[in-house]
Amino acid sequence: MQPRMLLIVALVALLASARADEGEGSLLLGSMQGYMEQASKTVQDALSSMQESDIAVVASRGWMDNRFKSLKGYWSKFTDKFTGLWESGPEDQLTTPTLEP
């Protein structure tokens, strides 16, 4: 999106310089150069912030991966401790005593 903006600004500068009179040309050219410098600085700032956000995304992904690995480790320890309770077969189940008269 930012390269489009730079292209549009350059196109506007070319159109404005083509329509400018000879007397107003230097004034218009100076103002357009100032505008172009400001626009290029804005684009550079936007690109640097995008790069910083990419670094932040990579860092947060690493943090999330570590958290999920830790969670999986806790879950496996939990399931290992209680596996005996969950895997009890039908012969291990309690039977209700029957009373005979």
Swiss-Prot record:
**Site residues, May interact with the LDL receptor:** 41
Q: How is it modified after translation?
A: The most abundant glycoforms are characterized by an O-linked disaccharide galactose linked to N-acetylgalactosamine (Gal-GalNAc), further modified with up to 3 sialic acid residues. Less abundant glycoforms are characterized by more complex and fucosylated glycan moieties. O-glycosylated on Thr-96 with a core 1 or possibly core 8 glycan.
Please provide an example of a Pfam family that matches this protein in its UniProt record: Apo-CIII
Q: Which Gene3D superfamilies match?
A: Apolipoprotein CIII
Q: Does the keyword field hold Signal?
A: yes
Gene Ontology CC terms, in alphabetical order: chylomicron; extracellular space; intermediate-density lipoprotein particle; spherical high-density lipoprotein particle; very-low-density lipoprotein particle
Q: Does the keyword Transport apply?
A: yes
InterPro entries of this UniProt entry?
Answer: Apo-CIII, Apo_CIII_sf
Top-rank taxon, per record: Eukaryota
Name of this chain's protein? Apolipoprotein C-III
Write out the entry's keywords from A to Z: Chylomicron, Glycoprotein, Lipid degradation, Lipid metabolism, Lipid transport, Oxidation, Secreted, Sialic acid, Signal, Transport, VLDL
What GO terms are given for molecular function? enzyme regulator activity; high-density lipoprotein particle receptor binding; lipase inhibitor activity; lipid transporter activity; phospholipid binding
Q: What does this protein do?
A: Component of triglyceride-rich very low density lipoproteins (VLDL) and high density lipoproteins (HDL) in plasma. Plays a multifaceted role in triglyceride homeostasis. Intracellularly, promotes hepatic very low density lipoprotein 1 (VLDL1) assembly and secretion; extracellularly, attenuates hydrolysis and clearance of triglyceride-rich lipoproteins (TRLs). Impairs the lipolysis of TRLs by inhibiting lipoprotein lipase and the hepatic uptake of TRLs by remnant receptors.
Q: What is the lineage of its organism?
A: Eukaryota, Metazoa, Chordata, Craniata, Vertebrata
Q: What is its main location?
A: secreted
A GO BP annotation:
negative regulation of lipid metabolic process
Which residues does the annotated region (Lipid-binding) include? 69-101
